[in-house]
């Protein structure tokens, strides 16, 4: 029996006969649903990545659903992989524009069936030796692939299987009777589609007119879930007699409405709203009018260069006008009960400070999307460190507050194979070849709606002007806007874009903030990412909801830039500086919730990986910057758990550069209290051995012994009764770690004196450690590290045998998890058989300078098959090799750990358990 057939037999046995068998198999049938941890879309993308051809049979397709597969389909096209899509015009659901998008797929043949009631949802993938299918309830729509509660089944079958033959035969039968999709067919369909759309529109308008007669002229606006939570937080702050608060809210998340709702709740006698831009000011006033009870229009006034409505109950002022002495001093300092500073990160500027320091309202609220932007005073300090609520991009998308987006990281134009790593050297930014390439990409990835209304961000003014001319000459109406243009001219151009009279506004950084163009349905980034904050600001220009679009397309041209690593940082919102997190984000198709998707073309993704590999994210200056940002937020020295709670740097990054956090604080003079040498070394121990949270039992045993000394039996019984899924061996290992007997001789030079002492009867804290506990500062750091250990341990709870697939582990970690008496780091040379475990640690790319005898040619033969070499000087008759060949009979489990190259340090990715393939052994030398 072939290995593939055997794998199928075991997979199907597990799927249809006995779920308890240990074989996990690559072909086990699987139910596909959409939930927080998995999406139907990710399976379809995964199958596409591996297939040699594909066939989709789906009744309903949306532009957004198709967009979520476009990057993958383009990569397949570049590899010569072709496919077929069979759909229909059933119920007139599919739009003419969507059919046009299907025609852009050069490697996909599309046909339409006129079979009555066509309602199929099937995806077939042909691989080299087998086929797989996703069949169930999901159409090719964003909601069906990512959000809706769906039931689909992933089935795999051998090429000669009856099921795949039946499904493929049915597909072929329909395909032969179907009509090829053409421009002519689309034009014909468009006429009937528009007629039906007009009929539906008339029905909707008639319904709206009937409803309008029954609805009051003024409808009370109620808060959404996130706004309601923020309002409760603001009230709680005021209830504590605090008079300032800060709202951090992603662009487009409705912070103005939130503010108006709070003002309605407070009902101040007089209210002041301050912002830097008159356009924002007018929009804010209109938003407030929708929320607040209006008695007279005169209740709302403006204080600008042209308006002086100083007696209005609700006054909206530009900072440029208000900050003049003769303007703000005409008011009494207590005149306003409630003052709002919009774009509050500007509040540290001198113009704002004059106003900020003059007025004494009962309550002052700051609102910003980017509190980190200030280069002067701390915004957090200005608002007394009272963060009422924080709405970041991911959370806003999950709550459906923002317009969904499809992000495409695409490969930038390469001139004659030359890769430039400095945009200022690239002479071809606006060459005809690159402009044609840009048009090709932006057309392929498209936009939602009938008219293209986009923003393009470039690197220089000259590039903006030249690109606008080139695009316009090719029929794509474009206008460049820069800081040299007047405010009035900018507004005229913006209105043209809103009305669809032009297709693109091209700028450098003019629209990073303070601009509101909800109609934008495509954002194009033609410059390297230099700042994750600016990246999100520019992406955010398209995230306001608008009736002209269902989603916004974001196209990011990724060149050979050193700063590409900032892209996953920006998109994920993850400020941990942890490279592993960013690499997982790049490979995880479920990395963002809601119908939004993040997609990378294969070459572009490789360029980001290269940038991540090259950059050092644990530089002292980056750690110090993260520290100062959190310190600014809190107003005091942060502890390690503060970094976690403030979504800042991962403490493990600090430990990769400093032996412990105390050492970092001393280096940068952030702490006055000094510890003894032994106390500092003990903190090194806790930072390296306890804080990672590898085993929950370690921190629990420590906490028990911190309370009082115990006999071994007392400790054992307490742990076994109170903690699930632990053994006596786990407790013994924890004790060996705490008394340092787990480690090799001389470890005290690094970790100081042991933490505990024990004899045949009692276990207690060592004298040196007891003395350290009398130091309040040492205690503070210790408690923080224990809390960090508990937090980190949560990610290990779901692991079988303490190991989680694709997590990173060291040889020492393995020794702890499997309760070896001693740290095996120095004795596991590639692999080791001990008890019933055999960990295998493989470095895939060896250094060129290692000896030929150890330059093993380990190699992945397939996704689940590895060619592996034993140590040198072994034969098939060697006792060790015989153990490996008979490992199943002897009950020995193999665990595979892999790192890419020696430079990756002591950590290896865990790929799972393995088994020897009978008959595959060979003595090479």
Where are these regions (language model features)?
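Conserved segment of the helicase C-terminal RecA-like domain
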Residues: 532-537, 541-571
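Long, largely alpha-helical accessory region at the distal end of helicase-like NTP-driven motors
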Residues: 194-223, 443-444, 448-449, 453, ...
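A short beta-strand element within the Helicase C-terminal
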Residues: 135, 504-507, 511-528, 534-537, ...
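Walker A/P-loop
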Residues: 239-263
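Conserved interdomain linker/interface between the two RecA-like ATPase lobes of SF2 helicase motors
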Residues: 387-455
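Conserved helicase ATPase core of P-loop NTP-dependent helicases/translocases
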Residues: 282, 307-310, 327, 465-466, ...
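Post-DEXD/H (motif II) to motif III coupling segment of the RecA-like Helicase ATP-binding lobe
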Residues: 345-406
């Amino acid at each position: 029996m072939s290995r593939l057939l055997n794998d199928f037999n075991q997979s199907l046995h597990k799927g249809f006969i006995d779920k308890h068998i240990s074989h996990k198999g690559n072909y086990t049938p699987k139910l596909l649903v959409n939930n927080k941890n998995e999406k139907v879309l990710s399976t379809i993308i995964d199958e596409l990545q591996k297939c040699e051809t594909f066939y989709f049979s789906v009744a309903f397709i949306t532009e957004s659903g198709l967009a979520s597969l476009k990057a993958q389909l383009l990569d397949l096209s570049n590899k010569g992989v072709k496919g077929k899509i069979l759909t229909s015009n059933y119920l007139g659901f599919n739009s003419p524009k969507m059919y046009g998008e299907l025609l852009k797929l050069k490697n996909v043949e599309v046909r339409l069936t006129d079979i009555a009631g066509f309602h199929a949802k099937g995806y077939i993938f042909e691989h080299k030796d087998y086929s797989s299918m996703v069949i169930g309830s999901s159409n090719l729509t964003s909601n069906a692939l990512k959000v809706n509660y769906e039931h689909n089944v992933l089935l795999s079958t051998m090429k000669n299987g009856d099921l795949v033959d039946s499904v493929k035969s049915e597909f072929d039968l329909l395909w032969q009777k179907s009509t090829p999709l053409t421009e002519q067919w689309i034009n014909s369909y468009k006429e009937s589609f528009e007629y039906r759309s007009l009929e539906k529109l008339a029905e909707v308008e008639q319904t709206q007119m009937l409803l309008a007669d029954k609805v009051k002229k003024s409808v009370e606006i109620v808060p959404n879930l996130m706004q309601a939570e923020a309002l409760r937080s603001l009230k709680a702050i005021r209830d504590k007699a605090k008079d300032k608060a800060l709202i951090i809210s992603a662009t487009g998340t409705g912070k103005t409405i939130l503010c108006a709702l709070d003002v309605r709740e407070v009902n101040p006698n007089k209210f002041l709203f301050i912002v830097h831009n008159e356009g924002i000011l007018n929009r804010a006033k209109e938003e407030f009018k929708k929320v607040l009870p209006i008695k007279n229009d005169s209740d709302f006034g403006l204080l600008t260069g042209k308006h002086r409505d100083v007696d209005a109950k609700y006054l909206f002022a530009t900072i440029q006008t208000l900050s003049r002495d003769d303007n703000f001093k005409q008011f009494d300092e207590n005149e306003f009960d409630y003052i709002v500073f919009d774009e509050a990160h500007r509040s540290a500027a001198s113009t704002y400070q004059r106003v900020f320091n003059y007025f004494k309202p009962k309550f002052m609220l700051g609102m910003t999307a980017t509190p980190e932007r200030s280069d002067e005073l701390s915004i957090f300090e200005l608002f007394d460190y009272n963060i009422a609520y924080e709405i970041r991009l991911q959370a806003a998308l999950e709550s459906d507050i923002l317009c969904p987006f499809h992000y495409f990281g695409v490969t930038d134009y390469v001139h004659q194979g030359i890769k430039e790593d400095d945009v200022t050297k690239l002479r071809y930014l606006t060459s005809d070849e690159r402009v044609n390439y840009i048009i090709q990409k932006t057309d392929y990835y498209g936009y939602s709606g009938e008219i293209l209304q986009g923003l393009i961000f470039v690197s220089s003014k000259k590039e903006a002007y030249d690109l606008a001319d080139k695009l316009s000459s090719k029929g794509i109406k474009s206008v460049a806007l820069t800081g040299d243009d007047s405010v009035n001219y900018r507004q005229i151009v913006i209105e043209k874009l809103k009305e669809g009279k032009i297709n693109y506004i091209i700028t450098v950084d003019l629209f990073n903030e303070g601009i509101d163009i909800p109609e934008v349905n495509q954002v194009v980034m033609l410059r390297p990412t230099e700042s994750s904050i600016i990246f999100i600001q520019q992406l955010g220009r398209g995230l306001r909801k608008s009736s002209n679009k269902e989603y916004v397309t974001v196209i990011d041209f990724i060149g050979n830039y050193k700063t590409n690593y900032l892209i996953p940082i920006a998109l994920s919102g993850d400020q941990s500086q942890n490279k592993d997190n960013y690499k997982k984000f790049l490979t995880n198709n479920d990395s963002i919730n809601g119908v939004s998707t993040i997609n990378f073309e294969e070459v572009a993704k490789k360029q980001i990986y290269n940038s991540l590999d090259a950059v050092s994210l644990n530089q002292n200056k980056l750690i110090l910057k993260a520290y100062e940002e959190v310190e600014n937020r809190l107003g005091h020295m942060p502890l390690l758990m503060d970094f976690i709670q403030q979504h800042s740097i991962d403490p493990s990054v600090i430990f990769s550069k400093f032996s412990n956090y105390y050492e970092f604080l001393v280096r940068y003079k952030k702490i006055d209290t000094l510890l003894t040498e032994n106390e500092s070394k003990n903190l090194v121990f806790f930072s390296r051995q306890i804080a990672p949270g590898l085993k929950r039992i370690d921190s629990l045993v420590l906490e028990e012994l911190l309370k009082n000394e115990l006999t071994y039996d007392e400790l054992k019984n307490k742990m076994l009764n109170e903690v699930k899924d632990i053994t006596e061996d786990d407790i013994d290992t924890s004790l060996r770690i705490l008394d340092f007997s787990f480690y090799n001789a001389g470890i005290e030079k690094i970790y100081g004196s042991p933490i505990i002492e024990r004899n045949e009867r009692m276990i207690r804290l060592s004298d040196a450690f007891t003395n350290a506990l009398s130091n309040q500062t040492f205690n503070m750091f210790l408690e923080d590290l224990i809390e960090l250990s508990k937090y980190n341990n949560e990610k290990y709870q779901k692991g079988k045998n303490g190991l989680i697939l694709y997590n990173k582990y060291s040889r020492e970690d393995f020794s702890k998890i499997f309760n070896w008496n001693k740290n095996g780091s120095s004795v596991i040379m590639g692999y080791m058989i001990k008890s019933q475990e055999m960990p295998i640690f493989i470095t895939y790319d060896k250094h060129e300078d290692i000896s030929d005898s150890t330059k093993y040619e380990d190699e992945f033969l397939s996704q689940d098959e590895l060619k592996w070499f034993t140590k040198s000087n072994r034969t098939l008759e060697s006792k060790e090799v015989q153990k490996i060949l008979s490992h199943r009979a002897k009950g020995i489990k193999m665990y595979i750990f892999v790192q890419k190259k020696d430079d990756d340090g002591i950590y290896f990715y865990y790929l799972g358990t393995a088994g020897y393939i009978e008959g595959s052994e060979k003595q090479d030398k």
